[in-house]
């Protein structure tokens, strides 16, 4: 969106109210865009906002912001069900716990929510203890390293993804991962 705002029925629509209600408890930060309904909070400085960055600048920006948790809300619709779980994988690579919408896009994410209240409960659960938080961060990083990063042991998995259609019996490496979950 040209003005860095997203429309009224955005992916945050079902969590906007709990974000507004928890401004006293959490520091909310948006990168790239923010929901129109939260504009007064952005303008007053109650919600921190950072404009879009070039793709290669994004990891450094995220590092400097040092987020505690990332969230990935999505409306449950055909378009979003067809998306990849890139936000989950990205957060795992950074070692940042991520709480994702409970739709098929994020079926591999261990922390998911359906409602805004569930999102807040999940944030509290992830951040309530330093040792639990570190364990979650480490587990996410291990997911990234063992399943997604371009390591030698993953090259065959990537080749299968490009050569064979979804659920094909020829996808031996990928299918074995799904069976072991």
Regions found by a protein language model. Give the residues of each.
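Short amphipathic alpha-helix
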Residues: 15-18, 87, 158
């Amino acid at each position: 969106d040209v003005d860095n705002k997203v429309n009224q029925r955005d992916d945050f629509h079902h969590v906007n109210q709990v974000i507004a209600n928890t401004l006293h408890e959490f520091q909310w930060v948006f990168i790239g865009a923010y929901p129109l309904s939260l504009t007064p909070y952005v303008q007053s400085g109650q919600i921190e906002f950072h404009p879009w960055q070039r793709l290669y600048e994004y990891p450094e920006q995220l590092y400097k912001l040092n987020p505690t948790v990332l969230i990935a809300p999505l409306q449950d619709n055909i378009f979003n069900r067809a998306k990849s779980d890139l936000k989950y994988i990205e957060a795992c690579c950074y070692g940042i716990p991520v709480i994702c919408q409970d739709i098929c896009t994020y079926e591999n994410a261990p922390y998911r929510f359906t409602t805004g209240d569930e999102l807040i409960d999940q944030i509290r659960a992830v951040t309530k203890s330093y040792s639990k938080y570190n364990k979650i961060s480490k587990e996410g990083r291990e997911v990234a390293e063992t399943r997604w990063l371009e390591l030698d042991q993953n090259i065959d998995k990537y080749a299968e993804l490009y050569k064979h259609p979804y659920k094909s019996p020829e996808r031996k490496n990928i299918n074995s991962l799904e069976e072991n979950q």
